[in-house]
Amino acid sequence: MAKTIKITQTRSAIGRLPKHKATLLGLGLRRIGHTVEREDTPAIRGMINAVSFMVKVEE
């Protein structure tokens, strides 16, 4: 079974760059406090890195 990580949106997407909004949607995050579980892959890690100031990650 692949390792998973929990990602929680902690800040609003209002007023952010369209690229950052698209990254949040790509991760499956829609609102503040929303948490999703994703497979721990380099692609997901890159997306998290792009919006690291807006999300909290739990291993």
From Swiss-Prot:
GO terms for molecular function: structural constituent of ribosome. It comes from the Bacteria. GO terms for biological process: cytoplasmic translation; ribosomal large subunit assembly. InterPro entries: Ribo_uL30_ferredoxin-like_sf, Ribosomal_uL30_bac-type, Ribosomal_uL30_CS, Ribosomal_uL30_ferredoxin-like. Keywords: Ribonucleoprotein, Ribosomal protein. Disulfide bonds: none annotated. GO terms for cellular component: cytoplasm; cytosolic large ribosomal subunit. SUPFAM superfamilies: Ribosomal protein L30p/L7e. CDD domains: Ribosomal_L30 (cd01658). NCBIfam families: rpmD_bact. Belongs to the universal ribosomal protein uL30 family. This protein is located near the guanosine triphosphatase center of the 50S subunit. Part of the 50S ribosomal subunit. This is Large ribosomal subunit protein uL30. It comes from Escherichia coli (strain K12).
